[in-house]
Amino acid sequence: DVPEIKFHMEHPLMKRIVELKERNYADYGQYDYAPKDYEDAQENYDSLLEITGDINANIIGPNSEDVDAEGPHCENGRVRYASKTYENLDATIKAGLCGMTMPRRYGGLNLPNVVYTAANEIIAEGDAGFENIWSLQDCIETLYEFGDEDQRKRYIPRVCAGETMSMDLTEPDAGSDLQSVMLKATFDEKENCWRLNGVKR
């Protein structure tokens, strides 16, 4: 029901985006829910966004005040989320809302980023803090793009099954602002390795 989402989902470029992401529907018949054509894909996306909206309206949104009140805390030397955060995560995992952009061969949904971003927006409406946790699944994009096949097979299915990832920023002047990170990586051709240069806490 969000006009901005509807605008993007019905944009004329969406058909080409879907064809490219679906590799002209090459997964059809090999994986459950792999679309056979553009109309089938759009039907799948609409269903997925409706499920996301239901989870937001019935679980994530109603839990948000309790999550804020309890907050994360230290328990036996480990940081724990608020109990309702685990309820939110469980609901998204059971609904299959993990590994959304990853290929089906790793257990992902192979969604275009447009659809994943729409789901992000829906979840953020209920609890922006939880959306930050849930959307850490997109950290796996880096491994998918730059990792080797062994790494992909070891880690991507875990994220698609609902294991959470993290983004750890430890520079003194960056805080949680990823854009402020000053660490530089340069390739040392002589030693055939990457050198990191920056200040860490």
State where each predicted segment sits.
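Glycine-rich, Trp-frequent "lid" loop and neighboring beta-strands that shape
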Residues: 109, 150-201
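Intrinsically disordered or highly flexible coil/loop and linker segments, enriched in small
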Residues: 14-18, 22, 57-69, 94-101, ...
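Glycine- and acidic
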Residues: 33-45, 69-74, 98-105, 120-126, ...
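Solvent-exposed, flexible loop/coil residues
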Residues: 3, 9, 13, 24, ...
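Internal helix-loop-helix
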Residues: 53-54, 84-157, 161
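Extended, charge-enriched "interface" segments that sit outside catalytic cores
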Residues: 1-75, 79
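Conserved beta-strand/loop block within the catalytic cores
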Residues: 77, 82-90, 181-187
